[in-house]
């Protein structure tokens, strides 16, 4: 399948899901997990485009527990925010995120490998997930879903439709 079709499919999925996603907030741990997911997605795309499979594998091995935890926490956010549709929403988000990173990489193809070499070394050497998240923020890693952080004034779950009266 052509990359443009994959991107269009991801964009369509986001357009369908965006209105429902927009009103949902994320707890700080969920927001951090989404940021770590974005960094991992970015590094995966760079690994493929720059033939850095071994470096990516080192990153994943070194931070496996943090990456697994971030994935679970992100899934928990989508289930909490969207109930029964949460798993499908998480899958759509994951697909859209990787497609967006691939499109971004295509735009910067000539500089992608050079510009991300240091990021890879820093990511592999990072001591913990907090440092990885700081790196993602300082490098302005693309995020396709950025819910507001929950406060006492924001809803923590999407509103349920009213039950029909019998």
PLM segments and residue spans:
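N-terminal signal peptide c-region/cleavage motif recognized by signal peptidases
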Residues: 17-19
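Short N-proximal segments of mature Sec-exported proteins
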Residues: 28-84, 94-100
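Compact alpha-helical subdomains of small soluble proteins
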Residues: 66-165
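Intrinsically disordered, low-complexity acidic/Q/S/K-rich activation/interaction tracts characteristic
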Residues: 11-12
């Amino acid at each position: 399948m052509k990359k443009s079709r994959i991107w269009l499919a991801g964009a369509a999925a986001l357009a369908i899901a965006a209105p429902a996603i927009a009103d949902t907030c994320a707890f700080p741990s969920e927001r951090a997990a989404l940021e770590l997911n974005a960094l991992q997605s970015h590094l995966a795309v760079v690994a493929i485009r720059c033939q850095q499979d071994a470096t990516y594998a080192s990153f994943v091995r070194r931070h496996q527990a943090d990456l697994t935890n971030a994935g679970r926490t992100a899934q928990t956010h989508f289930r909490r925010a969207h109930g029964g549709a949460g798993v499908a929403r998480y899958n759509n988000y994951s697909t859209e995120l990787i497609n967006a990173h691939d499109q971004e990489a295509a735009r910067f193809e000539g500089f992608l490998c050079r510009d991300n070499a240091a990021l890879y070394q820093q990511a592999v050497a990072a001591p913990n997930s907090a440092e990885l998240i700081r790196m993602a923020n300082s490098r302005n890693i693309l995020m396709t879903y950025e819910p507001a952080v929950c406060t006492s004034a924001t809803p923590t779950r999407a509103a349920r439709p009213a039950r029909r009266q019998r």
